[in-house]
Amino acid sequence: MRFHTFNIGKPHIDAWWARNRRLGIITAGFSGEPGDRGDTLLHQMEEGDWVIAYSNGHGFVGAGRVGPVATYRLLSVDELPSGWEATHRHLRQVDWVHAVASLVEAIPAKEVGRQAPRQTK
């Protein structure tokens, strides 16, 4: 089992974080193409690994267990749900075990002695 720190990416707003929690996912952006960095990052995680979510300007917002690799999806622009807040199209299932309800409740990186991750672009 490994631990991955992962930036939830833009926009850094409650609605985007709530969507990640509600859908039970972590997402990545980059170019939104097969084989890009987002694809690689989400495929490097093994089922049962922990993902520690971070939001720029706020801090750490959640921790969850990564689902099976079979839950990875690359959505086309047409498949994005109505109101999708981000440009991210790579998704992977996460069972959010610990999470703040609002970004204002985030734990700042300096409080845990870590730097902010830069993983989702």
Task: Label every PLM stretch briefly.
Residues 1-15, 25-37, 74-121:
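Contiguous surface segments at macromolecular interaction interfaces
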Residues 45-46:
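Short, well-ordered loop/turn sites that connect or cap secondary structure elements
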Residues 60-72:
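Short beta-strand-centered aromatic/proline hotspots
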